[in-house]
Amino acid sequence: MSKRHSSKYKIDRRMGENIWGRPKSPVNRREYGPGQHGQRRRSKISDYGLQLKAKQKLKGYYGDVTEKQFRRSYDDASKLKGDTSQNLIGILERRLDMIVYRAKFAPTIFAARQLVSHGHIRVNGVKCNIASRRVNPGDEISLGSKAQEMALVLEAQSLAERDIPDYVLPDGNTKVTFVRIPTLDEVPYPVKMEPNLVVEFYSR
C-alpha cells in the first residue's frame, strides 16, 4: 500500500469514520482508532475535544490540508458577511483540488491534488498547479490532454459511489464549470460535518 493511501486510511481510523465514503475504508470493518491503543474504550469527550475532532475531520476531508492553510480559510471566512461556518464550507469547496475531485477527474482528494500540482489541470484554459487556488463561480476547470487518458482519471469517472454535485456543471468528461458557491446542505459529505464546532474551536 502506498504512503498516500496509507495516510488516507489513517485519517479514517483516527476519526473513527469513513469520511470519504470509500468501500475499502478499514473503519467499515472495525470501530476503533489506529495504533496499539486503538481498541481501548473511548471515554466521554469534552466540549473542547468535540470541537477539535470536528476541526480535524473537516481538515482531513479536504486532504489533510496544513493547519496554516486551514486557519487562513477560517480567518477569511470570519471576515465575510453572514454565517462564518457556511462561509468556511464555501471557501473550502472553492479549492481547485476539491473541484477536480468533485468533477470526478480523480478518485481521491489526494489524487486530485497531485493532478493539479503536476500541471494537468486548466482554469479557464490556463494551466494552474496551485491546489489551494480558490475558484470563482463561472470558472471553467478542464483536464489537460495527457490527463484525459490517465488510468486514475478513467477510474474516477467510472466510480458509482459518488455523483457530481449540482454546483459543478459537467461539459462532457473533460470540463466542468463551477456554477456557484454551495451551502453546507448542498455539499455531499458522506459523514456529518460540524463547521459550527470549528468556529467555536477558533473562537475560544
Curated annotation (Swiss-Prot):
<comment type="subunit">
    <text>Part of the 30S ribosomal subunit. Contacts protein S5. The interaction surface between S4 and S5 is involved in control of translational fidelity.</text>
</comment>
<keyword id="KW-0687">Ribonucleoprotein</keyword>
<protein>
    <recommendedName>
        <fullName>Small ribosomal subunit protein uS4</fullName>
    </recommendedName>
</protein>
<dbReference type="InterPro" id="IPR018079">
    <property type="entry name" value="Ribosomal_uS4_CS"/>
</dbReference>
<keyword id="KW-0689">Ribosomal protein</keyword>
<dbReference type="Pfam" id="PF00163">
    <property type="entry name" value="Ribosomal_S4"/>
</dbReference>
<feature type="region of interest" description="Disordered">
    <location>
        <begin position="1"/>
        <end position="46"/>
    </location>
</feature>
<dbReference type="InterPro" id="IPR005709">
    <property type="entry name" value="Ribosomal_uS4_bac-type"/>
</dbReference>
<dbReference type="InterPro" id="IPR022801">
    <property type="entry name" value="Ribosomal_uS4"/>
</dbReference>
<dbReference type="Pfam" id="PF01479">
    <property type="entry name" value="S4"/>
</dbReference>
<dbReference type="InterPro" id="IPR002942">
    <property type="entry name" value="S4_RNA-bd"/>
</dbReference>
<dbReference type="GO" id="GO:0006412">
    <property type="term" value="P:translation"/>
</dbReference>
<comment type="function">
    <text>One of the primary rRNA binding proteins, it binds directly to 16S rRNA where it nucleates assembly of the body of the 30S subunit.</text>
</comment>
<dbReference type="InterPro" id="IPR036986">
    <property type="entry name" value="S4_RNA-bd_sf"/>
</dbReference>
<dbReference type="GO" id="GO:0042274">
    <property type="term" value="P:ribosomal small subunit biogenesis"/>
</dbReference>
<dbReference type="InterPro" id="IPR001912">
    <property type="entry name" value="Ribosomal_uS4_N"/>
</dbReference>
<keyword id="KW-0699">rRNA-binding</keyword>
<dbReference type="GO" id="GO:0015935">
    <property type="term" value="C:small ribosomal subunit"/>
</dbReference>
<dbReference type="GO" id="GO:0019843">
    <property type="term" value="F:rRNA binding"/>
</dbReference>
<keyword id="KW-0694">RNA-binding</keyword>
<comment type="similarity">
    <text>Belongs to the universal ribosomal protein uS4 family.</text>
</comment>
<dbReference type="GO" id="GO:0003735">
    <property type="term" value="F:structural constituent of ribosome"/>
</dbReference>
<comment type="function">
    <text>With S5 and S12 plays an important role in translational accuracy.</text>
</comment>
<feature type="domain" description="S4 RNA-binding">
    <location>
        <begin position="94"/>
        <end position="157"/>
    </location>
</feature>
